[in-house]
Amino acid sequence: MTDVSRKIRAWGRRLMIGTAAAVVLPGLVGLAGGAATAGAFSRPGLPVEYLQVPSPSMGRDIKVQFQSGGNNSPAVYLLDGLRAQDDYNGWDINTPAFEWYYQSGLSIVMPVGGQSSFYSDWYSPACGKAGCQTYKWETFLTSELPQWLSANRAVKPTGSAAIGLSMAGSSAMILAAYHPQQFIYAGSLSALLDPSQGMGPSLIGLAMGDAGGYKAADMWGPSSDPAWERNDPTQQIPKLVANNTRLWVYCGNGTPNELGGANIPAEFLENFVRSSNLKFQDAYNAAGGHNAVFNFPPNGTHSWEYWGAQLNAMKGDLQSSLGAG
C-alpha cells in the first residue's frame, strides 16, 4: 500500500468517526444527566444542607448542596454533567455520594445548575431555550463559593478537590491547572480531554445546542480563539505537572459489565472519548508527570453506575491527598 493510499484510508476513518459522532452525539449527551439510579438521593437523617450562595459575578444566588466534614475540613467539589439540572446536582440524583462520604472528614460541595456551562467564565451571556443568563462559573467556584463556605461553614478555602464527569471532567482539570492553591486534586471521569482539537469544538457545539440550545461560540468564541486551548486539559498538562496536582483519570471502553449501562448510546460515547484519555496519559508521562492514577479498564460505559463506583474507589486517595482526618 502506498503512502498516499494509507493517508486516504486514515482520513476516511476519521471522517467516518467524525460523521457518526456528529449524528449520534447530540442524542447521547443526555446520558450525563439521565434518570436516577437505585439508591439515589441522600437518605433522611444525613446532615445535608441546601444553601443559597450569593454570586455577584452571575447576578443571582446559586443553589449548593452541602454536607460538612467538620470544622476546617477540606472540600470535595462534585461537578455535574452537560445536562445539569436546576433542582439537584446529578451526583445526588444518581448516587448516594453523601452517604458514601458521611463522616469522612471531607466536606462535600455540589453546585446545582450550570447546564452546558463547562463550569467556565463565558465570553457572552449564555442564551438558550430558556432565555439568557450570565455564566461565570469559574469565578464562582474559585472565589465566591470558597470564600462563602470558609466564612459561613468553616470549610478550608484551599487544599480542595474537584471531581467531574463527562463535561465536568475537563472542567475539574482546568480548575486545578489555574487555581492550584485551591484545587490540589482533580478527578476526571469519562471526559473528552482534548476539546480544542480536531472536531472537538464542532461536536461540543452540537451537544450544547441539544442540551439547552446553547452556543459554544458564546462560551469560548470560534474554534481559533485561545480560550479553547486555555480550557483544554491536554494543552494544560505542563501546569498540572508543575503544580504537582494529584490526578485521578478514568475512562471505560464502552463494554458494559455487571454494573449495567448496557445500551448503545452509553457504549458509543464512552468508546468515543477513550482515545483522548489515552493520549492525555501519554502526554502527561512524557511531560514528567508522576502524581496520577490512570484507570482504563476493559469495560465501562458512559453512565452513572461507573462514575459512582469511581467516586467510591477514590475515597481513600482523596482523604490521604487532602489530609482529611
From Swiss-Prot:
Function: The antigen 85 proteins (FbpA, FbpB, FbpC) are responsible for the high affinity of mycobacteria for fibronectin, a large adhesive glycoprotein, which facilitates the attachment of M.tuberculosis to murine alveolar macrophages (AMs). They also help to maintain the integrity of the cell wall by catalyzing the transfer of mycolic acids to cell wall arabinogalactan and through the synthesis of alpha,alpha-trehalose dimycolate (TDM, cord factor).
Protein's cellular compartments: Secreted
Protein name in the entry: Diacylglycerol acyltransferase/mycolyltransferase Ag85B
Region named Fibronectin-binding: 98-108
Substrates-to-products reaction catalysed: 2 alpha,alpha'-trehalose 6-mycolate = alpha,alpha'-trehalose 6,6'-bismycolate + alpha,alpha-trehalose; an acyl-CoA + a 1,2-diacyl-sn-glycerol = a triacyl-sn-glycerol + CoA
EC nos: 2.3.1.122, 2.3.1.20
Coiled-coil regions listed in the entry: none
InterPro entries: AB_hydrolase_fold, Esterase-like, Mycobacterial_A85_antigen
Positions that bind substrate: L82, R83, S166, D194, F272, V273, R274, S275, K279, H302, S303, W304
Other remarks in the entry: Was identified as a high-confidence drug target.
Disulfide bonds: C127-C132
Active site (UniProt): S166 (nucleophile), E270, H302
GO annotation (BP), single: response to host immune response
Annotated signal peptide: 1-40
Entry GO CC: extracellular region; peptidoglycan-based cell wall; plasma membrane
